[in-house]
Structures are given as C-alpha cells and as structure tokens.
Amino acid sequence: MSFSVDMLANIAIELQRGIGHQDRFQRLITTLRQVLECDASALLRYDSRQFIPLAIDGLAKDVLGRRFALEGHPRLEAIARAGDVVRFPADSELPDPYDGLIPGQESLKVHACVGLPLFAGQNLIGALTLDGMQPDQFDVFSDEELRLIAALAAGALSNALLIEQLESQNMLPGDAAPFEALKETQMIGLSPGMTQLKKEIEIVAASDLNVLISGETGTGKELVAKAIHEASPRAVNPLVYLNCAALPESVAESELFGHVKGAFTGAISNRSGKFEMADNGTLFLDEIGELSLALQAKLLRVLQYGDIQRVGDDRSLRVDVRVLAATNRDLREEVLAGRFRADLFHRLSVFPLSVPPLRERGDDVILLAGYFCEQCRLRLGLSRVVLSSGARNLLQHYSFPGNVRELEHAIHRAVVLARATRSGDEVILEAQHFAFPEVTLPPPEAAAVPIVKQNLREATEAFQRETIRQAQAQNHHNWAASARMLETDVANLHRLAKRLGLKD
C-alpha cells in the first residue's frame, strides 16, 4: 500500500478538524488507526523521561492511566532516542509495553510494532505507536510514508498542546510564550467530576485566593493542593505541608508560628514555624477541622492581617503566604455545632473545591488501577502487570470506601499475592487476588444453551455466537459499542463474527 496525495490530504484535514475539541487526541489516533489498519495504536506525550498516553485505540482502558518511564520500557526509550521511524522485528528481545493489553488478545504478544517520535522543532513532544498481531503487518508502508504520517501527527499534537496551554493560562495567541509541554500532575481521571475539578484548579491557581478543599479520606486532596501550587505564580517558592490532625495541642502553636529560645521548656533555640517557611509560597493545612478553637482564632488573625508572632516573642513578623486548607469534615456542620469558627470558615472557603469520591468516578478506577499496576511493575522489576477482565469487573463494582488510597493498597497487595503464585516476571491480576468484602457483581445474562452432543470447538463457537448476538441486540447492532461492551477490539470482533457466520 502507498499513500496517495488525496489520502494524505484527507488525513491532514481530519487531524486538524478536531484540533480545538476536547476529543482532539482521540480523533487523531482513531483516524490514523483506520488509515494504517493496525490492531492497536496510541498517542503518547513526552514529559520528564516518561511517555503519558493521551489517546488509545484497540488497547485496554487502563493504558490511559499508565505512565511509561523510559528506564522501564526499552522499546519506548529506543523510540525517544531514534529521531526517526523505528521498526521492531517480530522476534525482538525488547518487551513490548502493550503485551497483554490488547483486549481479546491478552495471551498473545504483539508481533509487529512501529514507533514514530514526534517533534516540535528539535524538542521531542511525543510518540505514535502502531502495533499489530501479524509479524509483517506494517511492511507495506515505506519509512518515507511513515515519516509523513509522523510529521502530520506531530503538527497536530503540537498545535493541540499549544491550544491547551493557552486555554489553561487564559492567554491570547499574541501573548503566547514559546511552546512548552504541559507539566504532568498525577491527577488521573477523565470522569465528568474530575474534568470539572481540573478546570476549577486551572481557574483558581492563577489567582492568590485561599482555597478550601473538601472530600472524603483518601480522595487525593493533597494532590489537588499540589496541582494548585504548581500551576500558580508561587510555584517557584515552597509548598509547605502541615497535618493539623497530627499536632499535639502543646506544640501546635509553635509548629504554625515558630518560637524563640526559652519560650517554654525544651525551646533551646529560635525556630521558624510553617508560616515563615512558606513565606512567598503556599501553606497546605491538611485536616484543618482538627484545629482547636484557640488556634483557629490565631490562624484567622494571620489571614486577616498577614503577620505572625512566634511563641514567646512580642514582635510581629510579616509573611506573604497563600493558604490551602483541606478537610474530610463538613465544616458548615462544624460551624453550626460550635466546633469551627464561622469567620475562619468564610476566610478559608473563598474558593471551595470538592474532590469526588472514587465510587462516583466511573471508569477512572480502571485508569488509576493501570497507574498503580505500572508503579508496581517498575518497583518490583517485573516485565508486565496486567488486569484480567474479571479483576476489572470487580474493581468497577466495588464501592471503595477508602477511595484512591484503598485502591492503591489493594493493587499493591494483589501484585504481591499474584507474584507468589506464579513463576516468572509476568503478573496477571485475577479477581481472587483482591480481598474486598461484600462485593456484589451483576449476574451474567447467560444464554440458555441446550445440552447437545458437541465437541469443545463447536460448543465454544456456539457460546461466542450467542454472546455476540446479545451484545448486538443490547447495543442496537452497533459493532463499536458491542466491542466496548465485550472488552475487545472492534476489528477483532468483526473478524470473529465473520468466522462464526454472523456477518458477510
């Protein structure tokens, strides 16, 4: 196959047509996969020696949550270093990062792989990866043709990232600084609640307002505070953390405001408090609802007047500190109960943010699971850690009262258990590796299969036919929707349906 001028023109038009939309990256990767007829493709952004998936097609959903560090993925490192088209032979000894991550083909290793590094000028900004199950799948394309695709994709990615940068900074095109890849935060999630939270973070980060971050335990409030600080004008100065719940009353005031030598028994020298440490930066007060009323009054004075007094000192010190506070309590209820000052609540909650619990974030649980799987893979030196379909189903139906923190611990424990029961450096997480209490999975809508004399192949094909028919009926005969429901690739589903006689 060779690309005609019309085909290349159509690709360019399609890539640029969606560039201002939220689904810009998915449109790009879907178009390229259709043209190149590959089993799986991914668009990756390069940042700090790791590749971050922006869009995938034909790969398991948890890939979007993974962060591919170059030192743990020799193929991706080769792509980053090459500066040109990279073709990996079918018998390459370098492990493919997507082995076990193509739905419906978990037991098979990727055979054909092409990597296209994407550049903006001399800067590496990303990569396009193309994978196939047939060893010679990409032999029909010349390197020159693939370079053209890479150039088109690089231009589209560069423009899209620049637009995203301008949107996040609320800048006009004429005010734009030279293109820089956006900083990666570990706030992983594409659910509506997380998308809205990220937008609100972008809005408030550019200001100097105090922010109250509320959310259940384990939802990631500290990550929100970090994201606000890193996107703010104060990012070059310190972000200082203090857990108010861990402060004994006897030392809480000293921790916040510091003390002078001799202020109390054990004060053998002058000591700066957290407010002084955070001067010109940001102070994150976690579990703010645990502060005593006496300390709340002193904190209020700092927010009102911008000065502090060290314990044992009559002099005031001016500080310029932005305060971010977090709580898992309902502070309005605490105010009504007399346990939290109303005036302090209003000072802190100038711009309130609410972090959604994991049970309300839909498929984000799978993205986060992928992120933690990749962390475990690197930490334990494994070649791959993947989720079985049963494990994904279990994770999606568990309520996670401990939220993201509970998911992280569950993945780490499951990897250790799975590794202990399997030799080698490949780990597949099954449902039985998770110890969740009282998880009720929806009953499968199994078809009534008559008991007849069939061999195993015939029985398997009969089951596959009925499963595909049910999926098609439930999805109004939409093949793409049926493929998503069955967690398989739409191209593979088409091929299977043809083999089973379900379509021409």
Curated annotation (Swiss-Prot):
Positions bound to ATP: 215-222, 278-287
Pfam families: GAF (PF01590), Sigma54_activat (PF00158)
Keywords: ATP-binding, DNA-binding, Nucleotide-binding, Phosphoprotein, Transcription, Transcription regulation
DNA-binding region (UniProt annotation): 479-498
GO molecular function: ATP binding; ATP hydrolysis activity; DNA binding; DNA-binding transcription factor activity
Record domain Sigma-54 factor interaction: where: 187-416
Pathway entry: Nitrogen metabolism; nitric oxide reduction
Keyword set includes Transcription regulation: yes
Residues with PTM 4-aspartylphosphate: D57
Entries under InterPro entries matching the protein: AAA+_ATPase, GAF, GAF-like_dom_sf, Homeodomain-like_sf, NorR, P-loop_NTPase, Sigma_54_int, Sigma_54_int_dom_ATP-bd_1
Gene Ontology biological process terms in this record: phosphorelay signal transduction system
HAMAP family, per database record: NorR (MF_01314)
Function as written in the Swiss-Prot or TrEMBL entry: Required for the expression of anaerobic nitric oxide (NO) reductase, acts as a transcriptional activator for at least the norVW operon. Activation also requires sigma-54.
Protein name (record): Anaerobic nitric oxide reductase transcription regulator NorR
Biological classification of the source: Bacteria, Pseudomonadati, Pseudomonadota, Gammaproteobacteria, Enterobacterales
Gene of this entry: norR
